[in-house]
């Protein structure tokens, strides 16, 4: 029966005993007048290391007297016939004491062999019966366990078959009821039931289950084992039990394909744009919060607040065009104005103490004009008045500075520089620029008259007091900024395009920069940051180089610091320097 039988046999019957037990070791053979004690020795029981002895004692029984005699016999007197050993055993050792039996006959030996055989048979039969009883109990135990498992599996299979039959009946009935034939049959059966006043029996749908449970084998199986339950881990009270779950699943349309869920389009990029717009709003409001010491700071911060607002609207749609594309005519006029200023040294020397504070005043104007030009043109009209107010207040503060700074700037202006080396300039370029100037003046006589009326520079300003000079410089700054805007707008609207041969060359621009005009110095600082250009200016007709204003020297010294911030030159300062009489312009 395998290992399991041995294990169960050891458990039920105890430890197995060996055949060579102690009961077999000694046997008593009784005859009429003679008693002989023999021992049955196996090979494993023979002890080879017994002590040696020279004399062996033999026990003999006297038949007549019945007395036991002992004889000392040496090893040399013992023969092979006198040694008696058990059957089937042979040994070579002579240390075992021999037993002499001279008085036994052949008949007695046969009787003793028969008796020994019967005893062995009885003992072997007992052992065989004991093993059989153990195997019989093991077989019964196995049959009991296997029968229990088989019956339980059979009950579970029966319930499964009942569920499958019920599901098939439900599915087929549903399909038939939905078909055209089923609808007609249902109407006929319904009419018959209404006429006969009979109700439909719900158990008719489960005829197959009834037939299955009416089987004799199934009934016997369920009746014989009332405690046997099907193999499932659910209870009838649990909604997830077999029968209830089967009904719920069959009620659902399991034959229809499962509808695929619609893919939801992710709106992550839109959300990101909204988050960026919300995060940009508090940044703009933060720039608006800090307040400065004077009143004009509020106007300036409000104007700066509008700049990122406009750029945020137009970042992705369009980019602002560079001003260099639209200003070929304006650049030509700038060169002409600088020429007018170079030919008038008397006016520059008289206005020199006034321009030193104006240089510092015009620095903050650069930032405002930069934002005005880079932004859209609709903002020009709204931003003019606050900028003028800011400039006037800054001029008042700067006019109160000590005159020592003005003298220091004058000393710096009179220092010789490398500009004096370029006295001899090309006269052909001067004639070309003068001809261009005359052509532009003839085209726009009315516009120049309006600008001349607004310009009020006088060469004899030395006799006036310092207070009047400051007031005039303020008026000039406000007036020139307005006229400059009007001229720039007029040029864009009315002036025709100038041909390429009439435009100023790069060499003329470079020479203009070398003569130290404030226009060229400011323009170079801006163009170094953007596009490298060369400015040239023709020499005056009389061959004289005028002294430079302190504004020019300060621009040369601070050109590296403010070059990146200034994108365009100040139009107001250029017009103020170029305000001369027609007689001076003829030079």
From Swiss-Prot:
Protein name per its UniProtKB record: Protein IQ-DOMAIN 31
Q: Which UniProt keywords apply?
A: Calmodulin-binding, Cell membrane, Cytoplasm, Cytoskeleton, Membrane, Nucleus, Phosphoprotein, Repeat
The entry's family comment says: Belongs to the IQD family.
Q: Please give the subunit comment from the record.
A: Binds to multiple calmodulin (CaM) in the presence of Ca(2+) and CaM-like proteins.
What the entry lists under CDD domains is as follows: IQCD
Residue ranges of the region described as Disordered = 57-80, 344-587
> Could you name the domain of life of the organism this protein comes from?
Eukaryota
């Amino acid at each position: 029966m395998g290992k399991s039988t041995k294990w169960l046999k050891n458990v039920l019957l105890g430890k197995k005993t060996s055949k060579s037990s102690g009961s077999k070791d000694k046997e008593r053979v009784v005859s009429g007048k003679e008693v002989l004690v023999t021992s049955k020795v196996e090979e494993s029981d023979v002890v080879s290391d017994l002590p040696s002895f020279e004399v062996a004692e033999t026990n003999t029984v006297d038949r007549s007297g019945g007395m036991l005699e002992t004889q000392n016999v040496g090893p040399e007197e013992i023969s092979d016939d006198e040694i008696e050993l058990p059957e089937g055993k042979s040994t070579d050792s002579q240390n075992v004491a021999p037993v002499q039996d001279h008085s036994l006959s052949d008949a007695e030996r046969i009787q003793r062999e028969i008796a020994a055989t019967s005893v062995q048979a009885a003992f072997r039969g007992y052992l065989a019966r004991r093993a059989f009883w153990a195997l019989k109990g093991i077989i019964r135990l196995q049959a009991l366990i296997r029968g229990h498992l088989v019956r339980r599996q059979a009950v579970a299979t029966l319930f499964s078959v009942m569920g499958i039959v019920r599901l098939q009946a439900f599915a087929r009935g549903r399909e038939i009821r939905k078909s055209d034939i089923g609808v007609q049959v249902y109407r006929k059966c319904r009419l018959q039931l209404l006429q006969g006043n009979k109700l439909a029996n719900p158990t008719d749908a489960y005829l197959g289950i009834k037939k299955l449970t009416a089987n004799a084998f199934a009934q016997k199986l369920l009746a014989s084992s009332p405690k046997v339950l099907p193999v499932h881990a659910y209870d009838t009270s649990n909604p997830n039990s077999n029968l209830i779950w089967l009904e719920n699943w069959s009620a659902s349309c399991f034959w229809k394909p499962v509808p695929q869920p619609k893919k939801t389009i992710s709106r992550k990029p839109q959300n990101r744009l909204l988050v960026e717009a919300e995060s940009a709003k508090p940044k703009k409001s933060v720039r608006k919060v800090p307040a400065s010491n004077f009143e004009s700071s509020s106007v300036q911060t409000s104007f700066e607040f509008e700049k990122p607002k406009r750029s945020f609207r137009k970042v992705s749609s369009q980019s602002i065009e560079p001003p260099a594309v639209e200003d070929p005519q304006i650049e030509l006029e700038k060169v002409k104005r600088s020429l007018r200023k170079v030919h008038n040294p008397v006016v520059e020397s008289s206005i020199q103490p006034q321009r030193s504070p104006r240089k510092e005043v015009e620095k903050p104007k650069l930032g405002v004009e930069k934002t005005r030009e880079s932004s859209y043109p609709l903002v020009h009209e709204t931003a003019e008045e606050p900028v003028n107010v800011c400039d006037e207040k800054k001029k008042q503060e700067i006019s109160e500075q000590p005159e020592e700074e003005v003298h220091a700037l004058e000393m710096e202006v009179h220092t010789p520089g490398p500009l004096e080396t370029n006295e001899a300039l090309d006269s052909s370029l001067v004639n070309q620029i003068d001809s261009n100037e005359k052509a532009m003046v003839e085209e726009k006589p009315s516009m120049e008259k309006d600008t001349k009326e607004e310009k009020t520079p006088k060469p004899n300003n030395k006799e006036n007091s310092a207070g009047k000079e400051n007031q005039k410089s303020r008026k000039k700054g406000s007036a020139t900024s307005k006229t400059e805007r009007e001229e720039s707008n007029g040029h864009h609207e009315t002036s025709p395009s100038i041909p390429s041969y009439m435009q100023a060359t790069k060499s003329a621009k470079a020479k203009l920069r070398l003569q130290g005009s404030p226009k060229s110095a400011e323009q170079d600082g801006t163009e170094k940051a953007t596009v490298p250009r060369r400015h040239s200016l023709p020499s005056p007709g009389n061959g004289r180089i005028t002294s430079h204003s302190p504004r020019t020297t300060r621009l040369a010294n601070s050109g590296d610091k403010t070059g990146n911030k200034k994108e365009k030159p100040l139009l107001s300062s250029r017009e103020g320097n170029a305000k001369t009489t027609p007689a001076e312009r003829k030079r």
